[in-house]
Amino acid sequence: MSKNNLNETESKIEIEAKVVELLSNDKFKVELPNKKTIIAYVSGKIRINNIRILPGDKVRIELSPYDPTRARITYRFK
């Protein structure tokens, strides 16, 4: 019997968003293009490389299909 392996990147939804507010513990309130706000946290690569994210920055986020109210910030646009 073989297991059906679902690739992590295929199940994620990537969209661009704008950082609205800084929250504690590397969490941010981001605004989606449809004007909905959700909470996003910083990915490990951004945290390791000490990339600063400030309100007003445009970022790329990954939304999980299981919990669309939370996201992970994967890239900050310059």
Swiss-Prot record:
**Which keywords does the record carry?**
Cytoplasm, Initiation factor, Protein biosynthesis, RNA-binding, rRNA-binding
* Organism name: Onion yellows phytoplasma (strain OY-M)
Coiled-coil parts of chain:
none
Judging by the UniProt lineage, the source's domain of life is Bacteria
Q: Which GO terms describe its cellular component?
A: cytosol
State whether keyword S-adenosyl-L-methionine applies: no
InterPro entries attached here? NA-bd_OB-fold, RNA-binding_domain_S1_IF1, TIF_IF1
Q: Which Pfam families match?
A: eIF-1a (PF01176)
Q: Which SUPFAM superfamilies match?
A: Nucleic acid-binding proteins
Q: Where is the S1-like domain?
A: 2-78
Q: Which terms in the Gene Ontology molecular function aspect does this entry carry? A: ribosome binding; rRNA binding; translation initiation factor activity
Q: How does it assemble?
A: Component of the 30S ribosomal translation pre-initiation complex which assembles on the 30S ribosome in the order IF-2 and IF-3, IF-1 and N-formylmethionyl-tRNA(fMet); mRNA recruitment can occur at any time during PIC assembly.
Return the similarity comment: Belongs to the IF-1 family.
Cross-referenced NCBIfam families: infA
Q: Where is the protein situated, by its record's location annotation?
A: Cytoplasm
Q: What does this protein do?
A: One of the essential components for the initiation of protein synthesis. Stabilizes the binding of IF-2 and IF-3 on the 30S subunit to which N-formylmethionyl-tRNA(fMet) subsequently binds. Helps modulate mRNA selection, yielding the 30S pre-initiation complex (PIC). Upon addition of the 50S ribosomal subunit IF-1, IF-2 and IF-3 are released leaving the mature 70S translation initiation complex.
- Signal peptide as annotated in the record: none
Name it: Translation initiation factor IF-1
Keyword hit for Nucleotidyltransferase: no
